[in-house]
Amino acid sequence: MKLVTCGLPYANGKAHVGHLRTYVPADVYVRYLRMSGEEVVFVCGSDCHGTPIVVNAEQQGLSPKELVDIYHEHFIKIFDALNIKFDFYGRTDSDYHHHRTTEIVKRLIEKGYVYPKEIQLAYCPKCQRFLPDRYVEGICPYCGALARGDECDQGCGRHLEPGEIKEPRCKICGSKAEFRSQRHYFFKLTEFQDFLEDYLSKLKGTENALNYARNWVKNLRDWCITRNLEWGVRFPGEPNLVVYVWVDAPIGYISFTEKACEEKGCDWRKIWIDGDAEIIHFIGLDIVYHHCIFWPAMLKGADYALPSAVVASGMVKVEGKTFSKSRGYVVWVEEDYLKSGLSPDYLRYYIVNYTSHQKDLNFSWEVFREKVNNEVIATLGNFLYRVLLFAWKNFGEVRMEGVDEEVLEKIRETEQKILSALEEWEFKAASDAFMELATYGNVYFQNAKPWELIKTDKEAARRAVASCLQLAKALIIFAYPVMPESMERMAKAIGLDLENVRLSDAYKVDEVMKLSKPEVPFAKVEDEVIEKLQKVMEKRFRGEGEKMEQKEEISIEDFQKLDIRIGRVLKAEKVKKSKKLIKLIIDIGDEQRQIVSGIAEDYTPEELEGKLVVVLANLKPAKFMGVESRGMILAAEKDGKAVLLTPEKEVEPGTRVC
């Protein structure tokens, strides 16, 4: 048996294409497993706790539950529309989930893995409240980037413990926060160092997840697992504390399995206690730390079975730009895609087939149109419709004796390619395999010329059509996990029931194939539809209708305090273990300065060396990823990328900007 889970969507906002990189491949994987004869339980649910939900609810004048209800129903609707079929889709604010979370936390306490500790926490004197997680913003203590309370999302990506953030400010009122002491509870993560190193050496899954985790496990610290909130799972014996959301959210995999097994008639304990199943987590790359470090340590401490594999998708870009909801670089699943009337199968195919699962996916409406029209329609759809329509018109039913052995061998090869691809989590390779078979089918049909044979040799025409029908049957079966809605329609034309079909049925030859009039499998993606969607996106990129935030006015004296100069980059090199940071040695006239800048994703060291830049020279020194920075280079932003400010003409380094 296999248990397949998906990272829980956060019930705090709408579904976008970035979400689908987890859910569509997982659904495709589960469908292929079942068609291979595997017994599978497939679960997911809404993540309903945590400070972002509480903050958002406060800002909208809603209770956390009211906000969660809205987005929980939204995700159910989206998954249904895209034919993502979980055995059970739950929510973490349910009683059954609270029960399982409390049971596991109590077990960790009883076994001595949880202890209390007085810590310094950000406190807002104006709001008169402690500021957990997203209630506080400030500076990352490790790299100096802007950070939220529990995560350095703009810099090094580290998880931040309560009280670590520097220069904290209240997210609600903007006031400067102070630190006050309070008792919280910690999980002894450091006791699991040896276990985690051994576990990660054996864990299966995608290399992007495993490599990240193996680097992080070397510097473990105990983990604060309580928060000052009213919304969440109450921590045992502490009426004013709840369990941290990253403790209770993954426990949803267990509580949702319990509910799924109630409905399916299986025993959840065999999966999570006895370890009689493979547990496979599909997640986004941004939550690898939680799933490969925190989660297995908790499970080990509470005597639960461990995940067998962690499958992490690459990130998502939109029209080549870094995904950002705030900047408009986003495609919303419902309002952009579904409401345009496009088939859910097209989006499923694009998500799976655009690139390798571990690589970054770029969502482009132009590329989307080309892939659908040139691959799905012109290759797969063309073959299926031509063959099925010809067979129906000229035969009605076809005796299948004499199917070409070469055709059967091609079908078997395709099945093996798909199965091999699934073992490597390469869903693109699986979909490429059936597209290659469709290309072969088009050539075979064209070379056989049954429309000519039927005039002179009806038996030869029948054999040719039988071979093409076998290919059509195989393609319907192989493509079904990726494009279920369309393949169900095509299956009706050959009387094929896909409900209990097996991959091996693709090369089983029936005595007779009875045909009905086939539907056109796919509708062309029209230029007008794409142009309309592109205009919507361009408008969003420009932020039309949104006013730029106005900063507080300053005096000329304030401006004159800034020492802004022209500098020349003498040397540039990337900061180790950082994707964004680059270390620069800059000549600013009277000295050479070392400055760290977050432009490594937009400029190479070679592009920067010799370049004139604008430098803020009297900025207080700071450390980024342990590297000292004494100043700042100035840049604008265009399409989500940094654009350096440079003088129009050649200017000597050290020249002041005034």
UniProtKB/Swiss-Prot annotation:
It is found in: Cytoplasm. The keyword Nucleotidyltransferase does not apply. It comes from Archaeoglobus fulgidus (strain ATCC 49558 / DSM 4304 / JCM 9628 / NBRC 100126 / VC-16). Its cofactor is Zn(2+). It is an enzyme of class 6 (ligase). Its EC number is 6.1.1.10. Residues 558-658 form the tRNA-binding domain. Homodimer. ATP binds at K325. This is Methionine--tRNA ligase. Zn(2+) binds at C140, C143, C152, C156. InterPro entries: Anticodon_Met (IPR041872), Met-tRNA-synth_bsu_C (IPR004495), Met-tRNA_ligase_1 (IPR023458), Met-tRNA_synth (IPR014758), Methionyl/Leucyl_tRNA_Synth (IPR015413), MetRS_core (IPR033911), MetRS_Zn (IPR029038), NA-bd_OB-fold (IPR012340). Is required not only for elongation of protein synthesis but also for the initiation of all mRNA translation through initiator tRNA(fMet) aminoacylation. GO terms for molecular function: ATP binding; metal ion binding; methionine-tRNA ligase activity; tRNA binding. Its main location: cytoplasm. A motif ('KMSKS' region) lies at residues 322-326.
